[in-house]
Amino acid sequence: MIVAGVGCRRNTSAPDIEAAVRAALARSGLAADALDAIATTASKHDEAGIETAAARLGVAVVLVSEAELEAAGERTQTRSERVLALTGVPSVAEAAALAAAGPSARLISPRLVIGSATCALAASEAAP
């Protein structure tokens, strides 16, 4: 299972989010059809850009609770002091990817920033 964790500023466009996801996949040598889901914080439940990007990529959006983000936050590789102050986790993208991919997940692509979107990839043996 491959999950793209996404973080973004409010009203980030679907093309910007999709570009970040595709760049993370390319950096990892993966095609778009390897992706099983996009994960983000539950506070982004109404973010149209994320929903549209997921639809274009043919995957579901997994909303991750604050508690799940915090639990996965210990396994992140990168750190943004700004994001930590706002959300309580060092990287929303990395924590969301890890949380959605499951307890045995590992990061295969740390947080990548493209414009106002960030994307990280996590992999696990879990079924999507």
Predicted regions, residues:
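Structural motif
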Residues: 2-4, 36-37, 61-62, 105-108, ...
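Alpha-helical scaffold segments in soluble metabolic enzymes
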Residues: 23, 52, 94-98
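A short linear-motif detector with a strong N-terminal bias
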Residues: 16-19, 40-41, 85-87, 97-100
